[in-house]
Every structure is written in structure tokens, then in C-alpha cells.
Amino acid sequence: MKEYKVYLERARSRQQHFLYPLLFREYIYGLAYSHNFNRSIFLENVGYDKKYSLLIVKRLITRMYQKNHLILWANDSNKNSFWGYNKSFYSQIISEGFAMVVEIPFFLQLSSSLEEAEIIKSYKNLRSIHSIFPFLEDKLTYFNYVSDIRIPYPIHLEILVQILRYWVKDAPFFHLLRLFLCNWNSFLTTKKSISTFSKSHPRFFLFLYNFYVCEYESIFVFLRKKSSHLQLKSFSVFFERIFFYPKREHLVKVFAKDFLYTFTFVKDPNIHYVRYQGKCILASKNAPFLMNKWKHFFIHLWQCFFDVWSQPRMININPLSEHSFQLLGYFSNVRLNRSVVRSQMLQNTFLIEIVIKKLDITVPIIPLIRSLAKAKFCNVLGQPISKPVWADSSDFDIIDRFLRICRNLSHYYNGSSKKKSLYRIKYILRLSCIKTLACKHKSTVRAFLKRSGSEEFLQEFFTEEEEILSLIFPRDSSTLQRLHRNRIWYLDILFSNDLVHDE
């Protein structure tokens, strides 16, 4: 208990001041920040960094307290501006810039915790979202049951504010935060739902939601370490700062009342937990009743600690060999490969059946076509269409854009067990590129291909990947064919895109 108190005191000393550096420290405006949040695999957002300036945020926060500058039209609903600008645009600027400022100290704190855990050397290798799949290939084939869990989120923004207050020291920060979430948001929309706020202020909502997930995972990891025979080394523990022990005792009492045991009953050394965004995968090798205990643990944790309602029927426990789960834009399941081996001992011959488990990862073709249709590359049936908005660009720019999209898709989905779906997506993009160029030159597709040469024109769509692989591996046709059949994970993919978002 003493070491826990020391940890709590040390963690309280790390509470941050936010408004002081935001308002008074000029050097913070020179910080370069990477805006990977809105990057899309289909279209790059231009001018994102120029729109959200910390200097503008500082001026807006200063003017929020000057009431004579605030001009609102309560009777005229057609006027949607104050200070001479659009309200939603000002709100977006404040939320984005505000999220940028508060992310900086927490990122530095995460880096310091990684140094304390002595895994800072491998931190760069863990940044790639593709690093999850080699881990699943090594571990998941030894497990028997899997639970696909969608993490519930609070229905009220005040719950997210209460979670954030464990880390923040200055009270004016919360006055500004509640002003923005309650009063300010009421100017923008009559619907005060959290879904509306998440759509209008995605970056700021993502910041608050990440802290909710961080707090819930910190308690889970803390209790997991106490209930496991093995010691976890690759996790940093961030558990709740205020009223942690009374809540923990209450949670233990709930389990003792329901199951007549404490957390020591839920000892499962062979369990793995993987999360990305709002979905997590829980896999276990032991009997399903232990998975059921962890299921009820998550439900009680969300209800008792965070006042978040979760329906038990939404958490299913399925045999891994019979169930496919979706994670990071892939469909994954464990396939059983059966083979018969003939064994002979003296004059007796035996047939031995060997079952080998293999992780099968496939590309979800329907969500991919839906994403392409949303980006106006094809219709909902997968038939390619032209991209008229790109017709004003040069031929080189149009081809370069389509090649960049194909390259991103090829890199991301090269880990698939079957490449047929990936080749179909490339075919859709190739025909969409041809139709876009034909639309620009005001000719038919057949006439354009006849004039430019169909074989040489779009050969880059299929030869570029082979040229890259030939630089790494020997120029052998059999080697390249084998590489096309096998999975290749690119461990330099650092940003998410529309394809991996859980809907």
C-alpha cells in the first residue's frame, strides 16, 4: 500500500497547467505539429495547418472575456456569425487549437513513462499500426476463444471532463472547457448530444475520448497485473488518481457478491488484449467461463467507475476457429489446415492426421468498395466512374494521384492472405483514372486508349510494386511470385485512414 501511495503522490505532482502557457508563453506558437488526424488514404487535405493557428486561438480566448465584442442575434436565425465571422468556423478553430495545446504535455508525459519502462528503444518500432498483425500471427494461433468488444463511450460530455480533471491542476482550464462544451456549443446547435459534438469537433472529442480509454485501460492493466501469475513488462500503468481505492474495493465487493470470489479467481496467464480506436480484441486459451468473468469485469468497470452503460449481449465469446473478427480494416480468423501423414513401423502402417492452425487475414471487399464509392471513384456496385473534380489538373498530376492511392492501398493490404480483392480494387482505380483522363480530353475511353496506348499507359499500376520488391529480393520470377502470394507487412505505416475506422 505504501508504494501505491508514493505512486499516487508522484503522479499528482505531474498535473499540468494549460492556460498559462497557452496565454502567456510565446514560444509555444513555434512548435511544429504533425496533423495526421484528418489524413485520408484517398485525398490529402490541403491547407489544414494554415487554418488552425495557435495565435488565433490565443486571441479568441482573450476576447471571450470581453463581452462588448460578443455580438449575437437571438431573434434572427438567418444570421450565423459573430465578431464578423462564421460561428462554426470560430468554434472549429478554438477546438482544434485547444486540442493541439493540451496534447503536447501529455505526449511528453507518455514519452517519459516509456523511458521509465525501459522500452523507449523499441517505441519507434511499435508506432506502426501494422505491428499488431505480426503479434497476432505469433500469438493468436495458440488461443481457442476470442471476444470482439466495442468500447462504449459516455453519453454526456461532463463524464469526459471529470476524467480529465485527474490530470489538470489549474481551475481556469475547466471553466474554459465547460464554457466551450456547454454554453458555446449551445450557440452552434440545438442538439447537445455527444455524437453531434464528435462530428463538429472531431479532434477535440478524440482527445477527450482517448483519456477516457486511457483511464479504463489503466485500471484494467493494474488489476490484470495483480491477478496474473506473470508480470507484465510492456505496459505503463496510469490508474485513476482520485477515489481509486474506494472504487476498487467496491468493485471487489461486487465480484465477491456475484461470484463469491475476489479478483484472484480471475487468474488467466494466457490472455491477450489488443485495442485500436473503439474496438478491442480479448483472446484466451483457457475455458470460456474465464472469458465470461472478464466480460462481466469490463461491464462492472464501465458502470461503476465511469457511469457508462454497456449491454452484456453486445460482448460475444466465440471459438476462434469458427469466428471472424474485424480489426484495422482486415477480416481475421484462424484456419485449420489438415494434412495426413503416413507412418510405418515395422510392418504396420498408420495414417496420422495433423492439424495446423494458421491465421487467415483477408481484405473486406465490400467496405472497400463502399469507401471508394464514397470518394467518388465508383458506384455502390463497384463500377468505375470518372473523377470530374480532378479534370482541371494536368495528366501527370491525375496519374500521380491515382498512383499514390494505389500505392497506399497496396502497402496497407499487402498483408492479406488472398490478393484477389486487392487486384480488383486496383482495377477499379485504373479504369477510374482512364475515365477521368478521357473526360478531361473530351473523348471516349476507347478513343483515348487507342491514342495513348493501353498497354504502356497504365503499366505503372502493376509494375511499380514489383520494381520495389526487386530492389530488396533477387530478380527471380519464382521469388516474386512467391512474395505476391505471401503476406508482407510494412512497419512504417503511422497514420490511420478511412478504411480502418470502425463504423
Swiss-Prot record:
Q: Which residues form a coiled coil?
A: none
Q: Which UniProt keywords apply?
A: Chloroplast, mRNA processing, Plastid, RNA-binding, tRNA processing
Which Pfam family is one of this chain's hits?
Intron_maturas2
Give the GO cellular component terms, alphabetically.
chloroplast
- Keyword RNA-binding recorded: yes
GO terms for molecular function, please? RNA binding
Q: What are the subcellular locations of this protein? A: Plastid, Chloroplast
RNA-binding in keyword set: yes
GO biological process terms held by the UniProt record:
mRNA processing; RNA splicing; tRNA processing
Annotated signal peptide: none
Q: Give the highest taxon in the source lineage.
A: Eukaryota
Q: Which InterPro entries match?
A: Domain_X (IPR024937), Maturase_MatK (IPR002866), Maturase_MatK_N (IPR024942)
Predominant place of localization: plastid
Function field: Usually encoded in the trnK tRNA gene intron. Probably assists in splicing its own and other chloroplast group II introns.
Q: Which HAMAP family match?
A: MatK (MF_01390)
User: Which family does the entry's similarity section mention?
Assistant: Belongs to the intron maturase 2 family. MatK subfamily.
Q: What is the name of the protein in this document?
A: Maturase K
Native organism: Vicia sativa (Spring vetch)
